[in-house]
Design a protein with these regions (language model features):
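N-terminal intrinsically disordered/low-complexity leader segments
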Residues: 1-18
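Residues in the recognition helix of alpha-helical DNA-binding motifs
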Residues: 58, 67-68, 150, 198
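Hydrophobic alpha-helical connector segments
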Residues: 63-70, 78-113, 169
Length: 211
């Protein structure tokens, strides 16, 4: 009697997942260091110490870049908004408003610390790759929604006027955005801790004291 071998065993799936994560992490390093266009599938394979075929199986280069952002930003792959993250939901539900603001700033600082450089790569690559452009545009739309939800939370706590939600969301998006983080930390040499302190103060002075 012939026995059919199970090729979808948990151990095989775990190995495939580890290989994919290695490929995506290696690609992320190269994308940030060398740029999207200059990073080849062969270079990714060499960095990850896997075959070029394995890299191609992980997806086209655009898909690997998108996965690199998702892993850096959220720790897993998928189209996640900030407001869907359990850690942020817990922070925003705290009854102490000052504690929420401190936790919110800390959360966004960590998110930028891990993902801002990849976002910069995505922005540059979006001019050359339609798949990256679509993913980047989707990211920007989700971020705008998250910022509006942040501003609406401020209204719910009596921190700003309801009529100021749209403008407050725009300012919040600029203050917490990856470009602002990189301008201070990468370009000007700030530490993430300095940025976190500045961001907390900036939100209070430029949003809460104004709107």
């Amino acid at each position: 009697m012939t026995t059919t071998r199970d090729y979808s065993s948990p151990s095989r799936a775990a190995t495939a997942a580890r290989t994919r994560r290695l490929i995506v992490d290696s690609a992320a390093e190269l994308f940030v260091r060398d740029g999207y266009v200059a990073t080849t599938m062969q270079a990714i394979a060499a960095r990850a110490e896997v075959s070029v075929q394995s890299v191609h199986l992980a997806g086209p280069k655009a898909a690997i870049l998108i996965a690199a952002f998702e892993l850096a930003f959220a720790g897993d792959e998928g189209r996640h908004s900030l407001t869907e993250r359990p850690a942020l939901q817990e922070i925003m539900g705290h009854p102490d408003t000052d504690a929420v603001l401190a936790g919110y700033v800390r959360f966004l600082t960590e998110a930028n610390k891990h993902a801002a450089a990849i976002v910069r790569v995505m922005r540059a690559a979006s001019d050359a790759d339609p798949l990256v452009r679509a993913a980047f545009d989707d990211l920007e739309e989700r971020r705008a929604r998250d910022m509006r939800l942040g501003a609406e939370w401020m209204v719910s706590r009596g921190l700003i006027h309801e009529s100021a939600v749209a403008m407050a969301a725009d300012v919040l998006g600029y203050l917490t955005g990856p470009d602002t983080y990189l301008a201070f930390v990468d370009d000007r040499g700030w530490t993430p801790e300095w940025y976190e302190t500045w961001l907390d103060r900036a939100i209070r002075v430029l949003i809460l004291d104004v709107y």
